[in-house]
Amino acid sequence: MGYKISIDAMGGDHGLNTTIPAALEAVKKDSNLQIVLVGDHHKVKRALDRYSKVKKIKLPVLQRIAIHHASETVGMDESPSIAVRKKKDSSMRVAINLVKDRTVDACVSAGNTGALMATSKFVLKTINGVDRPAIVYALPAFNRETKQLSKTYMLDLGANVVCTSEQLFQFAIMGSILAASSKGIAEPRVSLLNIGEEEMKGLDNIKNAAKLLQGCDFINYNGYIEGKYIFDDTTDVIVCDGFVGNVSLKTMEGSLRLIESLIKKTIQESSLLMKIPIVMALPIFKKMKKGMNLDSFNGASLLGLTGIVVKSHGGASANAFETAIYEAIKEIKYNIPKTIQESLEKVL
């Protein structure tokens, strides 16, 4: 089965220097994939020619890449309202329009998160039964028994600062569907992020959401989960409001940077004698770093829309952006919006 994806080629901190090489690699590796690069035609064509020569991309592969002109770009610090109302020919807007028109099956952008969410919601609208879309991201999770690295899906990560219990319930359904499709499991475990595991703890919206989940046969509700267990493979989906989710995600990113800095500092300050066992342990460190490589987890989904939109990290490398493209392909294959719609009709 073939599939086509539009890419906001101008979006993100690095723009064409990330999106073009990522698109070329993805198309080269997947013969069923077609990509539409959306942006300033002259700039996109020039970058495409340059990178295709560097990567020695053959003509049959290049023939599966098209360019769609867009005269404007949404800045990373631009107001979502300005992006929606005034930049109707931005690379972001046009890429999403292609999803609405069914010219493509999905859109991937590394652009401004607020603008992407606002534009996607304005153009594509939400699925019936969904009040607000949510941002969901796959986090690395380690199973202490099997010693295997897995994924845990967490939502919302910033789209909705305040949520009702009904909205948290909707997020749980959407997250469960995504996890079931992505991880290939029939009944994904769903947990609510809370300050404790006891039933009486937490805000009213969380406790009321727990009651809704307990009464839903469709959801494999796993109770509350505390922040310290996010990376333990004890659940498949973690549900929270956008404020808590965004703060949690950025705290995780900061913690990883701190650990990396401390390791480097320790190595630099060690004596020559101490550096010998460190050098011997370098293969272990490299393997550990590979397992914690966030590039392999890039690609946040905007769930609850009538079409597929995947958000790449703004500062993503080409490898990381390529991962976001594969996330979009996965959602296309499982037709996530349609599956969510059908499931909501059964439980709401």
Swiss-Prot record:
Coiled coil spans: none
Transmembrane segments: none
Catalytic activity: a fatty acyl-[ACP] + phosphate = an acyl phosphate + holo-[ACP]
GO molecular function, one term: phosphate:acyl-[acyl carrier protein] acyltransferase activity
Localization (cell): Cytoplasm
GO cellular component, one term: cytoplasm
Pfam families: FA_synthesis (PF02504)
Function noted in UniProt: Catalyzes the reversible formation of acyl-phosphate (acyl-PO(4)) from acyl-[acyl-carrier-protein] (acyl-ACP). This enzyme utilizes acyl-ACP as fatty acyl donor, but not acyl-CoA.
PANTHER family referenced in this protein's UniProt entry, alphabetically: FATTY ACID/PHOSPHOLIPID SYNTHESIS PROTEIN PLSX (PTHR30100), PHOSPHATE ACYLTRANSFERASE (PTHR30100:SF1)
Protein name: Phosphate acyltransferase
Species for this entry: Francisella tularensis subsp. novicida (strain U112)
Gene, per the UniProt record: plsX
